[in-house]
């Protein structure tokens, strides 16, 4: 009787399988990003750190956009994020607007903007200095 362990004849190191996403502390799938980088013919070879870095960047961008869109939804007294909230979040943020400047968001609408020349002119007379109040 050789190898009298409880492993059932299978040599195991005692560690459970851990995904690369959980090792990196990410929610985005590192394995899927790696597969897409390989299948996309971007390069002949893909390093081990490249999909981790790319997944982290994508997760950060998604979190940033969703944070701003959630704030826009809350400002409009809504509990559900709609494309209009995404549009407002992206267009009101300078860096995201620069990154996604040529992106069209379906059902996003436009930013409310009225040109200064079209606004009614304010009269500059102050009360107490009218000519009708002479003695």
Swiss-Prot record:
Q: How does it assemble?
A: The nucleosome is a histone octamer containing two molecules each of H2A, H2B, H3 and H4 assembled in one H3-H4 heterotetramer and two H2A-H2B heterodimers. The octamer wraps approximately 147 bp of DNA.
Instruction: Please name the InterPro entries in this protein's record.
Output: Histone-fold, Histone_H2A, Histone_H2A/H2B/H3, Histone_H2A_C, Histone_H2A_CS
Q: Can you tell me which family this protein belongs to?
A: Belongs to the histone H2A family.
Chief location of this protein? nucleus
Instruction: State any GO CC term.
Output: nucleus
Description of its domains? The [ST]-Q motif constitutes a recognition sequence for kinases from the PI3/PI4-kinase family.
Q: Establish whether keyword DNA damage is in the entry.
A: yes
Q: What else is known?
A: In contrast to vertebrates and insects, its C-terminus is not monoubiquitinated.
Q: What is this protein called?
A: Histone H2A
The UniProt annotation puts the region (Disordered) at 1-24
Per its UniProt entry, which superkingdom is the organism in? Answer: Eukaryota
Site keyed Not ubiquitinated: positions: 121
Report any one BP term from Gene Ontology: DNA repair
Purpose: Core component of nucleosome which plays a central role in DNA double strand break (DSB) repair. Nucleosomes wrap and compact DNA into chromatin, limiting DNA accessibility to the cellular machineries which require DNA as a template. Histones thereby play a central role in transcription regulation, DNA repair, DNA replication and chromosomal stability. DNA accessibility is regulated via a complex set of post-translational modifications of histones, also called histone code, and nucleosome remodeling.
PTM characteristics: Phosphorylated to form H2AS128ph (gamma-H2A) in response to DNA double-strand breaks (DSBs) generated by exogenous genotoxic agents and by stalled replication forks. Phosphorylation is dependent on the DNA damage checkpoint kinases MEC1/ATR and TEL1/ATM, spreads on either side of a detected DSB site and may mark the surrounding chromatin for recruitment of proteins required for DNA damage signaling and repair. Gamma-H2A is removed from the DNA prior to the strand invasion-primer extension step of the repair process and subsequently dephosphorylated. Acetylated by ESA1 to form H2AK4ac and H2AK7ac.
Record PTM N6-acetyllysine, positions in chain: 6, 10
Which residues are modified to Phosphoserine?
Answer: 132
Q: Coordinates of motif [ST]-Q motif in the sequence? A: 132-133
């Amino acid at each position: 009787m050789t190898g009298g362990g409880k492993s059932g004849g299978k040599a195991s190191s005692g560690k459970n399988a851990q995904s690369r996403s959980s090792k990196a502390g990410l929610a985005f799938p590192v394995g899927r990003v790696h597969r897409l980088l390989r299948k996309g013919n971007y390069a002949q070879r893909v390093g081990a750190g490249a999909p981790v870095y790319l997944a982290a960047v994508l997760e950060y961008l998604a979190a940033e956009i969703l944070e701003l869109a959630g704030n826009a939804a809350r400002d409009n007294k809504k509990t559900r994020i709609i494309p209009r909230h995404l549009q407002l979040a992206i267009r009101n943020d300078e860096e995201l607007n620069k990154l996604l400047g040529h992106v069209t968001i379906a059902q996003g609408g436009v930013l409310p903007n009225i040109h200064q020349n079209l606004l009614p002119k304010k009269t500059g007379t102050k009360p107490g200095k009218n000519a009708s109040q002479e003695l």
